[in-house]
Each structure stands twice: as structure tokens, then as C-alpha cells.
């Protein structure tokens, strides 16, 4: 490499001699057979030691390793690792460790036929395992688009996972970052359940000085330093687990003091991305969310906050909405060809609104209390308005439908009244009457701009699905 500096040197180094080829021979890229062999055999301590020894010598060497799970000289990946969590756990390590990840022929498709260099054609008529391919699309490929976070070693930190005073050698834990993007990876390469804490990284070598004054120092960083967190009671760390899509929140100060806790089932892997720190708001929402969630994840922190703030409102809304929506759906979508008369429909609507009166009054009273200083009609008045609107909608929907015009927009502009407008629009939106019935339930709040604040659209979707 010194004699021909512009040459890229690639090596296929087996028998666990990768370090020799990189350190002594100066190869730029080397097949890392230790990755495949040790992880396949679950020799986890050996492989963790190899990583720790490498970063103690020179972390930059990790960038030169080509990590793989199979190649033309080895059995296929599915033959060695299967198609379940162990395969995807090791594959996650492969694409999130520094270095160059390499997929073998047919690995993603789950092919089982081994191809040597002498093969000129396939002898098995194999088809891709679509479930395996789909899981790659969900678990693996999105992380590959984030390779800029994982590929380099400048911010790579490797951790021991401590549990009851000892290190669990079966869990791989490391963090990395690029710019303001951070990630933490955990994988338990054993069937047994495992848990523990990470706080301080394993030591790694750093070259300091220049010229003849260059020397190597051993350094270590905490997970809080690796994620650039603050030792502040008012700061919170928010992150997303890639595979499940769950969001988590932790106190930044707690991570600084204790580190990060992880509990993994056998062969379970978790990748935390979109890690960022926030300062608590005046209403202490992040503190309340952190205390309420108690470490568990949720799919949307904003929705979780809404559910906490509007718990009583949503309970009264659910009691009202679930008592009327199924009945309204039945009225607007009759299962028989025999259409009821207007008088019969009025009778059905009256029976429905009478049956839900208590739930309706309770909802409108509760919602008015939540509205605070917004001027709104009294609960009884809103209930009466709802009954009138619902009757009008049901009767309108029962009329002979309008013929769909060639130009709907032009026809809407020419509509002579509200009823004509609705009937014309319904030719392109069959669900319109049910949507308007929902509007009838919350009309006063929608008109006052409260429906969006209280996320009623989301709540209605829960009851329609």
C-alpha cells in the first residue's frame, strides 16, 4: 500500500486472519469471516472481544472489514442462520456495524442452493420467499438508507451490557452518529432472554499529536456523551424503535446518571433512531408523558398526550358516538331493497336520539367544560340541534339519488341550495352522509375550531374501523 498509494487492495482473508491482513499487509478491504462464523456459532464473547481488541488498536480498521453472512464458498445464509429472528438480528448487525455489508447471491430471496465459482447455472428451480423479502423491506432496507450513520467509526461507541455486576457477553450494543443524527443498536445473539444496562463505552484508541509527536491514547465515552444529552432535570430524550415503530421517552439526566436499560428476548434486536433531546414545556407534557408511560413505547407521543389531556372528554364522546354511529350507519345503508317511508325514518331517528339523550347531554356538558372561555350553546340546545340535523340528513339520503354529472365541479357551482349541493357531491362520495352525520354530532365544536384541537377526526376513525 505504501509503494503504490493509488491502488485499492482487496483481500479474501480466512482462518480468522483479517486483522493481520489489515494491520500488517495494509489491505483496504478484507472479508471478515469471523463475523459469519462466530455469530453463526454464537461465539459471542469471542466476536465482542475481536471488536474491542480492534478498536483498542485502531478503530479505523473496522471500516475496512467486509461483513457477510455467506459467500460463494460457504453455505447459503438461510442454511446457516435460518429465516427467523437470528437471521435478521445478525443481518441488522451486518448493516449497522462500521465497514462494508455484503449480501450473498439469493440471500434476500431465501435461496438454498449453494453456488461455487465453478457453477454456470442454477440446478434448482427456486422462487423467492416473499415473506422473507417483505421482512427485508420492513426491517433491513430502511436501515441501509441510513448507512451514513453507521459506516464510519469516528463516533462509534461499543458497550458492555452490565447485569447484576457482570457483563452479558451475548448482547451486542453500540451507538453511532453522523451530524445531528444518532442511533443505538442492541442485539441478543442467544435464545435466552437477556437484560442489562449500558453506560460507559469500551476503551478505544485515539491518535493525538502530529508528526514525530504522535501517540495513542485510550479513551471512553458515556452513552449520554455519545447521544449528546444534557445533565438537566428539564431535558428529555425521545427516540424511535425502528422495527416496531414505537416511540420512547426518557429523562436525559437519568441516562447521564444510570445509562440506558435494555431487555431483549432470545435473538431480539432493537435499533433506536430519530434520537433527539427536547426541553420540557410550560404544561410539563414531557415530564407527564415520561411518568405515565413508565418506559413503555407508544406509536405517537402527540396522540398519547391528547389521550391524557382529554381523557374525560374522550370517555363521554365514546359513550355517545358508539351509541349512535352504528345505528346511523344502518339507517343510511339499509340491507333491504324495501325503502322505509319518510314517516318511518322520522320515527327511527326519534327513537335513536331519545335512546342516546343521556350520553349526548353528558358529552356536550363535558365538552363545554373543556372549551373553557369559548362561547358555546348549552348542552340541551346542542342535543336538539343534533336531532334536527340528523333527521334532515337521513331523509335527504333516502331521497332518489342525483344523477352523476359529467362535470361535478360545474354542477356544484350551479347548485341552487344546500340540499342540491349535498346530493350532487354524494354522487362522487358515497360516504358523505355518514361524514355529515359525524359533523352533526360535533357541529358547535367544529364551527368554533375546537374539533381539530380535540382531534375528533381521529376519534371518529376509531369508531368507523
Where are these regions (language model features)?
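A cross-family glycoside hydrolase active-site/sugar-binding cleft signature
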Residues: 10-12, 68, 104
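Extended catalytic-interface subdomain
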Residues: 67, 71-75
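Active-site beta-loop-alpha junctions enriched in small/polar residues
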Residues: 12-16, 71, 108
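Short, acidic/polar
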Residues: 86-91
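Active-site neighborhood of glycoside hydrolase catalytic domains
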Residues: 1-18
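Conserved protein kinase catalytic core
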Residues: 18, 76-77, 112
Amino acid at each position: 500500500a505504501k509503494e503504490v498509494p493509488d491502488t485499492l487492495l482487496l483481500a479474501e482473508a480466512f482462518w480468522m486472519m483479517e486483522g493481520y491482513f489489515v494491520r500488517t499487509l495494509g489491505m483496504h478491504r478484507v472479508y471478515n469471516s469471523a463475523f459469519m462464523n462466530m455469530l453463526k456459532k454464537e461465539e459471542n464473547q469471542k466476536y465482542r472481544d475481536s471488536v474491542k481488541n480492534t478498536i483498542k488498536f485502531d478503530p479505523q480498521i473496522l471500516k475496512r472489514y467486509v461483513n457477510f453472512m455467506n459467500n460463494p464458498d460457504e453455505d447459503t445464509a438461510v442454511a446457516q442462520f435460518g429465516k427467523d429472528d437470528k437471521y435478521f438480528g445478525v443481518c441488522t448487525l451486518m448493516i449497522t456495524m462500521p465497514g462494508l455489508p455484503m449480501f450473498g447471491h439469493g440471500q434476500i430471496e431465501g435461496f438454498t442452493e449453494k453456488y461455487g465459482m465453478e457453477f454456470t447455472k442454477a440446478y434448482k428451480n427456486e422462487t423467492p420467499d416473499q415473506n422473507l423479502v417483505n421482512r427485508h423491506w420492513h426491517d433491513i432496507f430502511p436501515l441501509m438508507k441510513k448507512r451514513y450513520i453507521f459506516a464510519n467509526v469516528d463516533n462509534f461507541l461499543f458497550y458492555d451490557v452490565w447485569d447484576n455486576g457482570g457483563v452479558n457477553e451475548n448482547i451486542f450494543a453500540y451507538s453511532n452518529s453522523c451530524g445531528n443524527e444518532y442511533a443505538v443498536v442492541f442485539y441478543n445473539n442467544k435464545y435466552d432472554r437477556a437484560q442489562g444496562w449500558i453506560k460507559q463505552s469500551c476503551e478505544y484508541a485515539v491518535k493525538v499529536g502530529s508528526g514525530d509527536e504522535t501517540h495513542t491514547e485510550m479513551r471512553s465515552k458515556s452513552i449520554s456523551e455519545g447521544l449528546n444529552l444534557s445533565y438537566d432535570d428539564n431535558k428529555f430524550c425521545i427516540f424511535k424503535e425502528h422495527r416496531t415503530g414505537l416511540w420512547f421517552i426518557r429523562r436525559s439526566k437519568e441516562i447521564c446518571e444510570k445509562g440506558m436499560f435494555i431487555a431483549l428476548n432470545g435473538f431480539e434486536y432493537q435499533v433506536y433512531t430519530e434520537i433527539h433531546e427536547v426541553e420540557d414545556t410550560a404544561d410539563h407534557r414531557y415530564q407527564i408523558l415520561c411518568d405515565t408511560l413508565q418506559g413503555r413505547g407508544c406509536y405517537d407521543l402527540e396522540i398519547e398526550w391528547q389521550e391524557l389531556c382529554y381523557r374525560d372528554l374522550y370517555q363521554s364522546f365514546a359513550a355517545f358516538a358508539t351509541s349512535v354511529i352504528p345505528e346511523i350507519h344502518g339507517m343510511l345503508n339499509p340491507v333491504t331493497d324495501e325503502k322505509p317511508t319518510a314517516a318511518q325514518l322520522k320515527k327511527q331517528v326519534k327513537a335513536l336520539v331519545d335512546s342516546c339523550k343521556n350520553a349526548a347531554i353528558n358529552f356536550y356538558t363535558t365538552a363545554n367544560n373543556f372549551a373553557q372561555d369559548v362561547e358555546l350553546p348549552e348542552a340541551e340546545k346542542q342535543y336538539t340541534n343534533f336531532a334536527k340535523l340528523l333527521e334532515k340528513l337521513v331523509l335527504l339520503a333516502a331521497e332518489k339519488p342525483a344523477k352523476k354529472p359529467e362535470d361535478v365541479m360545474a354542477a356544484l357551482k350551479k347548485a341552487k341550495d344546500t340540499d342540491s349541493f349535498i346530493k350532487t357531491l354524494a354522487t362522487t362520495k358515497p360516504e358523505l352522509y355518514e361524514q355529515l352525520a359525524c359533523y352533526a354530532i360535533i357541529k358547535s365544536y367544529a364551527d368554533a375550531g375546537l374539533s381539530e384541537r380535540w382531534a375528533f377526526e381521529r376519534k371518529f376513525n376509531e369508531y368507523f374501523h
